[in-house]
């Protein structure tokens, strides 16, 4: 009888441990989602100039009282076929809310390891500005393909939509309070709205559905310095990678 009681107590204890552990995981997942909601709720912003009127949604660091801040937007697509260089194309814009001016650059990069295994980059940048929600090169570009890519470029923030974020379940959750840093990874399907939008705009050489990674640093309450990035990973292997990354950051302006 005593053995039976001990066995029952052991099972109850094990059940409690599993329940508490699962509960902590769910709690962290909910907090990570909530920390991203303030940023992702802004998607999509079809007219980027609307960001001139948007104030910071969470405190990242102390701002000068005369500084309205600067938005930094970045989107890039990277593909690497087996045995080839990692080819990256993307754009970064700096939107100064004080001067209501936007400048940045479009970039093309090919990264390949040398004989010693060290990555060698070959990045080319093309300076741009934005006027009336249009991206315009600030220097002459002889390559017609690059010029067209710049003119047709759209940031993920302009077409992405995370209204179904709450429906993403059973994420792979990671949290390090020492840094602090956190992430949530979800397996998506090809029927996901954002996946369809990416396939519509990019030549993605795989039919595999991607994993969505939400990663950030700083306090989960969004009250400290940090960043938040979004990444869609279609393929992640040695010498073979396909991913899309996006970031929207608000920070103090360098020139007030």
Curated annotation (Swiss-Prot):
Belongs to the staphylococcal tandem lipoprotein family. Keywords: Cell membrane, Lipoprotein, Membrane, Palmitate, Signal. One of its GO terms (cellular component) is plasma membrane. Residues 1-23 form the signal peptide. It is a lipid-anchor. A lipid is attached at residue 24 (N-palmitoyl cysteine). It comes from Staphylococcus aureus (strain COL). Pfam families: DUF576. A lipid is attached at residue 24 (S-diacylglycerol cysteine). The keyword Transmembrane helix does not apply. It comes from the Bacteria. This is Uncharacterized lipoprotein SACOL0081/SACOL0082. Its main location: membrane. The lineage of its organism: Bacteria, Bacillati, Bacillota, Bacilli, Bacillales. It is found in: Cell membrane. The keyword Transcription does not apply.
């Amino acid at each position: 009888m005593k053995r039976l009681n001990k066995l029952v107590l052991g099972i109850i204890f094990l059940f409690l441990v599993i329940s508490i552990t699962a509960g902590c995981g769910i709690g962290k997942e909910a907090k990570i989602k909530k920390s991203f909601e303030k940023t992702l709720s802004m998607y999509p912003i079809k007219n980027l100039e609307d960001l001139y009127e948007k104030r910071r949604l969470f405190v990242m660091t102390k701002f000068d009282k005369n500084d309205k801040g600067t938005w930094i937007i970045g989107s890039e697509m990277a593909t690497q076929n087996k045995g080839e260089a990692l080819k990256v194309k993307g754009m970064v814009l700096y939107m100064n809310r004080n001067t209501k001016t936007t400048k940045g650059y479009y970039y093309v990069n090919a990264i390949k390891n040398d004989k010693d295994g060290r990555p060698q980059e070959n990045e080319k940048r093309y300076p741009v500005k934005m006027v009336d929600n249009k991206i315009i090169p600030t220097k002459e570009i002889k390559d017609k393909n690059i010029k067209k890519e710049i003119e047709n470029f759209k940031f993920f923030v302009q077409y992405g939509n995370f209204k179904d974020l709450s429906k993403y379940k059973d994420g792979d959750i990671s949290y390090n309070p020492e840094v602090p840093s956190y992430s949530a990874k979800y397996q998506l399907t090809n029927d996901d709205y954002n996946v369809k939008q990416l396939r519509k705009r990019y030549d993605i050489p795989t039919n595999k559905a991607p994993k969505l990674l939400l990663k950030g640093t700083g306090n989960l309450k969004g009250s400290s310095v940090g960043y938040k990035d979004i990444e869609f990973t279609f393929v992640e292997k040695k010498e073979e990678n396909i991913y899309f990354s996006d970031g929207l950051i608000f920070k103090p302006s360098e020139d007030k």
